Amino acid sequence: MLKLFSAFRKNKIWDFNGGIHPPEMKTQSNGTPLRQVPLAQRFVIPLKQHIGAEGELCVSVGDNVLRGQPLTRGRGKMLPVHAPTSGTVTAIAPHSTAHPSALAELSVIIDADGEDCWIPRDGWADYRSRSREELIERIHQFGVAGLGGAGFPTGVKLQGGGDKIETLIINAAECEPYITADDRLMQDCAAQVVEGIRILAHILQPREILIGIEDNKPQAISMLRAVLADSHDISLRVIPTKYPSGGAKQLTYILTGKQVPHGGRSSDIGVLMQNVGTAYAVKRAVIDGEPITERVVTLTGEAIARPGNVWARLGTPVRHLLNDAGFCPSADQMVIMGGPLMGFTLPWLDVPVVKITNCLLAPSANELGEPQEEQSCIRCSACADACPADLLPQQLYWFSKGQQHDKATTHNIADCIECGACAWVCPSNIPLVQYFRQEKAEIAAIRQEEKRAAEAKARFEARQARLEREKAARLERHKSAAVQPAAKDKDAIAAALARVKEKQAQATQPIVIKAGERPDNSAIIAAREARKAQARAKQAELQQTNDAATVADPRKTAVEAAIARAKARKLEQQQANAEPEQQVDPRKAAVEAAIARAKARKLEQQQANAEPEEQVDPRKAAVEAAIARAKARKLEQQQANAEPEEQIDPRKAAVEAAIARAKARKLEQQQQANAEPEEQVDPRKAAVEAAIARAKARKLEQQQQANAEPEEQVDPRKAAVEAAIARAKARKLEQQQANAEPEEQIDPRKAAVAAAIARAQAKKAAQQKVVNED
């Protein structure tokens, strides 16, 4: 009795809620054996034919490749793709792929050479001697992925299962009403399928192996039973036909009675599921050493003349397969990749066959009926009754349409397997699956953005923490550097402080004068001398600063000198071209000569105070001096040739002479105050200039005496008064100069010139006095 009960439990199956029973159309294609399709002229191999990232390219344009040669490298979850035939790589560019929107993905385009040569194949017939890791790596590098429709890398799936897998389930249900690829594969290659199952069992070491197959495949069931006749480790479970019993969660519940938790995987409950086609691909990869380059594809529909199942090379254009099967398209012909419930309509027929392509359906206009117009939801709950995942499709529809992503997530939209049962039974013809696909894509995009934001935040926080640690370490180093001085340093500091205090005490001690002793004033004298020296140094610095600020630019000075020379030449030409009647006023000439001499002295001082770097060209200086002497001689000649009728008023001349002396004294004082103590005067030059000035003064007096009119008389008393005033002013000036500070130096040249002028004026006054007495 106990054995009977155990046997009953062993073969027990469960039933899931919901599901539908659409009309079956499998007989269109499952009656003919598998056949090969002629090679296409061009193959388009997308680099991404699986869930995950695309691999790294290992070929380039112009390379010759063989069948089975890797086109990409598989690292991590990146699954490699292989050349479906031998030929030449003509392009590597984006190309539209098997997607509802025909999205362009990077693809390798190969022109076949028609030879279909394989790479050297190394099979592992003794795979049981290989380790688990070696087998998983070989399966991964040979490009094996889930061929049931998901496209998940098989090697990654086996690696993730680990040692916690207790039940291995082989999915042979194939519940779509048109698809017969697995059915025909089990009929024609049952032994190879079972061998692939044994390889998977060797890797996972499960306690039980279950094959789930629907009862609408009698030929496949009989072939499997024949192969498993002597096997006791693999159980074949025949289940009732119900859509979608081929779903992973639904088949797991049917065979084990266990439900996969929301948001979880079947491996969480110790179950791992593989497709029949995947098992066959594993066998070819491990034992035969052949990468996956082809798969079984169902060609069905009333628009195809020769429906059936074919071995289609990956990368073959869909148009090539349909034309080989006798495709007769209508005006508004549609082609569906996949079944009528879970498939999608191809936007055009040049997309390639990929690893997840299991069916190409070309229905006629009457086969699927006219598309119905979408209407409003009537809340009939028929979709909820048909949902195999126990969801509320009508609520998910409203949430998806209203962009309420949080509520859609709360209502477990991620558990939707997109089987299309809800849309099949909907009386309002609402394409619910399309809404759910779009909502899940938007939620995935939001989650990805949140993930990137979280990663960015983590990086920012890590950076802030690192900066804080560096700051704390830096402060700690500063604190450790600011330690107390050593004992010897303390002694040195104390000694220095003692010396400072001693000096301060000595400075503040009063000076005591004892009777009979002279006081020691050396400290006071030294302090006074130091203060004087400091004051002189400050005054010298201030004087240097003022001199540097007032130094003329040598270039500007040269320009001004050139302009003055040009004006002088122009004046000479005008004077030379003047009429003989036009005479020169001696007073104006004397004034101009005095102004010219003053400007010359000022220019000499500016040049003397210029920076030592700027040097004066001696040749230019000599030329300018010669020009000045020539101008002076010419002026003297003009004065000598003046008309005798024009006379000079002695009183006006005396007044002008007094004004000139006052201006000269003021200019001398300014020049003495601004003069550098370093400037020295050559006594010989001063004597020469004084002699020249005296000679000119005598000559001028003689001219004035000769030109003076006898009729004009000068008052002797006024002249005597003016002479006395001049002598008094001269004495006062001498006293002021004698009382000046010893630091101020008098320019000998200026003094000589002033003395000569004074003597000339005195002589002139005396001569005028003698003339008046006569």
Curated annotation (Swiss-Prot):
It is found in: Cell inner membrane. GO terms for molecular function: 4 iron, 4 sulfur cluster binding; electron transfer activity; metal ion binding. It is a peripheral membrane protein. Binds 2 [4Fe-4S] clusters per subunit. Pfam families: Complex1_51K (PF01512), Fer4_7 (PF12838), RnfC_N (PF13375), SLBB (PF10531). Signal peptide: none annotated. Keywords: 4Fe-4S, Cell inner membrane, Cell membrane, Electron transport, Iron, Iron-sulfur, Membrane, Metal-binding, Repeat, Translocase, Transport. It is an enzyme of class 7 (translocase). Residues 369-397, 407-436 form the 4Fe-4S ferredoxin-type domain. Its main location: membrane. [4Fe-4S] cluster 2 binds at residues 387, 416, 419, 422. Its EC number is 7.-.-.-. GO terms for biological process: electron transport chain. Disulfide bonds: none annotated. InterPro entries: 4Fe4S_Fe-S-bd, 4Fe4S_Fe_S_CS, Ion_transpt_RnfC/RsxC, Nuo51_FMN-bd, Nuo51_FMN-bd_sf, RnfC_N, Soluble_ligand-bd. Residues 602-750 are annotated as: Disordered. PANTHER family: ION-TRANSLOCATING OXIDOREDUCTASE COMPLEX SUBUNIT C. Belongs to the 4Fe4S bacterial-type ferredoxin family. RnfC subfamily. Part of a membrane-bound complex that couples electron transfer with translocation of ions across the membrane. Required to maintain the reduced state of SoxR. This is Ion-translocating oxidoreductase complex subunit C. It comes from Escherichia coli O6:K15:H31 (strain 536 / UPEC).
